[in-house]
Amino acid sequence: MQSKFIKHQGATLHYQIGGTETAPVIVLLHGGFGSIADFAPLLPRLQQHYRVIAIDTRGHGRSTLGTAALTYAQAAEDARQILRHEGVEKYSLFGFSDGGTTAYRLGAADKNIEKIITVGAEWHKKHLDGVRPMFETINLDFVKENLPKQLAAYQAANPEPDAEKWAAALKGMWLDEGASGYPNENIRQIQAPCWRYVAKPISCSPLMIGRH
């Protein structure tokens, strides 16, 4: 995998690209407090069959946080910018957790997506009803106590580490109930085949989303 960087809306975004150049493109989007490194076990197999583009979300891995607020809408726009830069027209998405939520936003807005797979990803702000008290406690102390490995990896990899801002940015994204947050009912606009894995795989096609 080759590392590349582009500047976009105040941030330097890091991504890696590899695999078979003429193969279908798959874009990997990691979760909160994670990075491209989370996909390391999958990359050897994926590169045999796909042109793989793995993106460090702004503020994560080797991507700087920049000046724009970290939101699901911003993460989707960052991914679009990278894909435009690489000349990618059609692609599939694999998103874990926050990466899956970003994938839903991309799928709802963009019609050039071939397939979507998400793992442990939320799509509606109503899920906040059960987790808001925990999200509201997130700060640097929370990260130090509960996510020491992720914190150490971030501090080692990020060119502009600021763990307090990092935690605050994610807290803001997770609690965002506005237009820049969860896709909510817009998920019905997804036209690509979509598989959502929680405890078991569930279709997230427009016809199925209301049943789960």
Regions found by a protein language model. Name each.
Residues Q9-R62:
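Conserved HGGG/HGGXW glycine-rich cap/lid loop of the alpha/beta-hydrolase fold
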Residues D56, S92, E114-I117:
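Residue in the alpha/beta-hydrolase core beta-strand immediately N-terminal to the catalytic nucleophile
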